[in-house]
């Protein structure tokens, strides 16, 4: 057993369960896993083409530490399949696959899961070790408590601590030392990873009731609506996620084979590819599908398919900080970006594929979404000849 896990353990690491991990002890008797990542997919859904996109803000924010430490970030972008020229477009977005690949490149090149943003390096393999420990935990509360104990083994500590009240539970960020995170990416990442990892382990979404941040609403704050799907509070006295206490008793339903598969692909997809099937937003996107060339289903049909009333569905979408019209618009935007990356498709054909009968209307809508025309966006995707 690792030191620091004697209090209510139930979570044990046995190398025989993880024979493929190159385990060696360090000077403190702790487990070190050198060089353990080979890519990322979310929740074992690697083969599914994702139609989700990620704001260029998160691409640039993820690169801040690498730039500060002198890495060639343009080369990192190219390795991830992202043209550096695309980032010149103010409202550019990349596919979730591209963003996931960028996370892999950063961690592999830097050997630091904090990507140069934390108060110290987090060696590649730290997340894998924590996951191997918590898979034997009986329920979500035990997962979060043991994960926090694991994080305390490293100084300065960067972690999330579980606090339990009468009806509510909170995951509260604990960050010691000086962080180099001007764009808040490290803090956002830790919240997202701990929340989505817990949801995966218990096989159900941990429905958030509130997300708090101890900094002013950032310029990219609108993106938070689609990340947390709950009310947001900025300039709070802490960074925390609040949810119903009942989730803490939910049993861990994943087993070691599932975790081994999960660790081949995580945690980058926890950041880039949220399990939106657990939200009304995601369910509506799934019902609409990817064929946007035909008339889309109306709101009443969608509500019936989801076994709810239109009034209730509107209220739930409001709780998720969105609307039916916004879901349709963003789905068209994301699919248009996906098709534009396929250079062989004429732009007029793309307009029809995403539901526009008039190319001029598509051009206006796309410029509203991204700040540039479809043609200019494609040029940015293609990059300069030197790329």
Please identify what each model-predicted range represents.
Residues 3-171:
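N-terminal low-complexity or simple alpha-helical regulatory segments
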Residues 128-134, 176-180, 248-249, 269-271:
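Short hinge/gating elements
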Residues 159, 163-248:
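DNA-contacting interfaces and partner/effector-binding or oligomerization modules
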